[in-house]
Every structure is written in structure tokens, then in C-alpha cells.
Amino acid sequence: MNLLDPFMKMTDEQEKGLSGAPSPTMSEDSAGSPCPSGSGSDTENTRPQENTFPKGEPDLKKESEEDKFPVCIREAVSQVLKGYDWTLVPMPVRVNGSSKNKPHVKRPMNAFMVWAQAARRKLADQYPHLHNAELSKTLGKLWRLLNESEKRPFVEEAERLRVQHKKDHPDYKYQPRRRKSVKNGQAEAEEATEQTHISPNAIFKALQADSPHSSSGMSEVHSPGEHSGQSQGPPTPPTTPKTDVQAGKVDLKREGRPLAEGGRQPPIDFRDVDIGELSSDVISNIETFDVNEFDQYLPPNGHPGVPATHGQVTYTGSYGISSTAPTPATAGHVWMSKQQAPPPPPQQPPQAPQAPQAPPQQQAPPQQPQAPQQQQAHTLTTLSSEPGQSQRTHIKTEQLSPSHYSEQQQHSPQQISYSPFNLPHYSPSYPPITRSQYDYADHQNSGSYYSHAAGQGSGLYSTFTYMNPAQRPMYTPIADTSGVPSIPQTHSPQHWEQPVYTQLTRP
């Protein structure tokens, strides 16, 4: 630090001039400069000194590189560097996309770069603790505060560098390197847009994703061969010929909700889906579904079995109608399960009102293997046509005996009045899973689900009744062709319009 002594007067003068300094960093830098400032570098590097020093000195800046920095700086640098053979240092080859062999030619510095480079070198030597980013900010602020006369030496130096650069590289053309990150971002965006398209069948699969334990439980109980792996991975929709047709429409229905990160689609609120649009495309290729596929949409574990208040809609995920707005189908099947079920177990939910008992002349013994088929159809029709009772269709939950399921499956072709989805040949697929359905009813302790599931028999998957019927009042029923008496429309409740069930027969 003995270098400092001869220049104490100079630093005192600088400190006087620094009283109006715009930035504390710069004032400290210039004040503590350990090297002679006669070269004019201090004058250029910090704004406030220009009134202390003669105006002619900044012109020295344009001279050779040696004069740019104070003597002590040059000596120290040469002392450090003299031991190195710089021919051994590899050239900093910055690859310029097209020609990988040529070193990258930098652009000529503009006036600010000339100023910033000289000032940064000086300040970095004096104050090594300064953070480079803060230094850059301060240099930029100072540059904006300089007036034209103060900037002139840097502007002239920059012009000289530009002319020199043009001589050295006559065919130079500025080619900024492209950022690779932009490409990655685009690729990510493309992936995201690919993910946002859902096939129409993902709608059905999305019901399975209501809750993780329910999806795994249902898939393992009902179709262990097919769906036991579904609980671990994301639901994969079955491929159908018309997958792309619906993708755009379903996109709109999703209301822009992105896919969950884990790969599970969010459960779809079918209040927003127009069944008019769905039925045309989805129903047309519904024939490619295996009937076991639908078992996973039976009620998940977490859902209540009984709607609490009249008119409240609970989406149970089953294809039965879960709203208490009564329909002929629900009325018929609720009373059907009431008629054939054993006495209710003690753990019946308290909020379910006791459903009125069916008339005694229509009682069928629970264990009777062959009930009169015509009487069953008559039971359904008469019960659903009693408006006073069907107004009270609070579903009663009770356990059903296995014979109830087998009876329903034997008679399922006779219940076509409620299953226009004409699938008598699907009924053989039910008996293998009769026991597991019964077990599941035990766990759930809610026979109301199975009043739809098994009571409806082959009509279980008909007509997409998982749409809340109170919000889809756009249909009128099609009379069925099976010879069973049709649903009487005159006695149906007034506040609910009849839905049209599209009649589907598998070829």
C-alpha cells in the first residue's frame, strides 16, 4: 500500500468532487483508488470527477491499450502474466451454428461497452468483493447520467473500434445464436396440447378416477382379469374407431382444466356435458365396449347411499339415477328391490325413510327360483305408475340375497320395458360375478345401488342414466318392441320431463 502515499492529495480532491456522486459504490471506488489517476481512467470511469480534472485528459482514452489503465495496474498484470505461455491456451471457440471450426467473431463494442469494460476492470481490481451484477447496474445508471461531452471519448473510441472491426472482418455479418431453451419450451407446449385432447371414451374412464381406493376396489372386485392394474397407472381408454371425432368437443366440455400431473383425469361433471352431443358419437361406438368395462363405474366406496334431501343430486358414479327426482325407472327398480329383498338389516342408514311396502298380492317369495315373469313386469309397471308413491322415492338401503340377483338375471329379458338398450345376450356375463357383487353390497351395506345394478339386470347400462335426469329434460320415451307393457306416461311426476332412451341393439 506504499503506492498510496504519493496520491493522497489526489484522492482528497476526488472526495471533494464526490459529494454529489450518484451512487455510493462508485464514490467509494474512485476515492479509494490506489493507483495514479493521471491517465484519465478515473475521470472516465466515474461521473463526478469530470469537474475536478481538465477536460483534455479524457482524450487520452483513445490512445493505445497501455494508456487505458494506471501504471500500477499494468505492472501488476504483467507481473502475474509473465510466467505463462499464452500460445498453449486453447482459443475460446464459441460454436457458430453453421461453421464449427471458425472462432466466434464478436461484435464491435458500442460506446457504453467501451465505458463499462474499462470501468469494470478498474473497479473489479480495486474492489474484488463487488458483485458483478451490482457493478453492471451501477455502471448502467452512471452511463445514463453522463452528458454528451462526458460520453464523447467513449463514442469516438467505439467508432474507431467499429472501423477497425470492419477492416479486420470485411464479410462480418451479425448472426445471433438461437436459444435452445425456446425450442424446449415449444416442445413442452406441444406436449401439453397433446395431453389436453381426451378421447370420448376417457369420459367413461374418468368416472373411475373419482377416488383412488374406490377405483382399485371396484376394478379388483368386478373384473379382476381386466382392471386389477388400473389402480396403479393412469386410466387408459379402450381404443375405438372414432376416437378422434369427439376430441374437440370433449375439450370444450372440460372447461380448460388441465390433466392432473399424476396422469389421472379429473372426474367429469356431467351437468356440463350435453348428452345430445355425446349420444350421437359415443353411443354409436358403444358396441365395442366389453360389458365388464362398465363394472368399474359402479358406486365408489366414499359415496353416500341415500340422497339426504328431496331434489338433491348425488353423483355416485353408478349408472343408476341418483337424484331423488323420481323417474319411472328408479321408482320401478327401487320398489322391485323392496319387493324381493329380505328384511332390512339393523345398520340401515337413519336418514332413509321407510319406503311403503308393496301391495301383498304382488309379493314374490325371496327364495322362489322361478317367479312368474309376467307378474314381475306388471309389478314394475304398476309401481312406477303410482304417483303418490313415486313422489317419495327416497331409496331404501338394504342387503339383497344372492337369489335376488340370480332371479333378476334369469328374468332380465322381461325387463326390457326399462332397458331399451336391448342386451339379452349380455346377461350370461353376470352370473360369474354374482358373488362378488353380493360381497360388495355387504361392504357397502347399500342395496340401493344394486337395486339398479342387479335389479335392472341387462338394463343396467342402458340409456346413460348417470346423467342427472332432472337436468336433461330433452327426451320423450320410445315405446319398446318387446311386448311388455310400456311405461305409463300419464302418471309420471309433473316436474320431470320424460327422457328419450335411445334403443340400441348389438348387431
Swiss-Prot record:
Bias-annotated ranges (Polar residues): 42-52, 378-420, 483-507
Q: Where do the record's region annotations for Dimerization (DIM) lie?
A: 63-103
Region: Transactivation domain (TAC); residue ranges are 392-507
Expression induction or repression: Upon lipid starvation conditions, expression is activated by FOXO (FOXO1 and FOXO3).
Q: Which SMART domains match?
A: HMG
Entry-linked Pfam families: HMG_box, Sox_N
- What is the designated name of this protein? Transcription factor SOX-9
Recorded source organism is Mus musculus (Mouse)
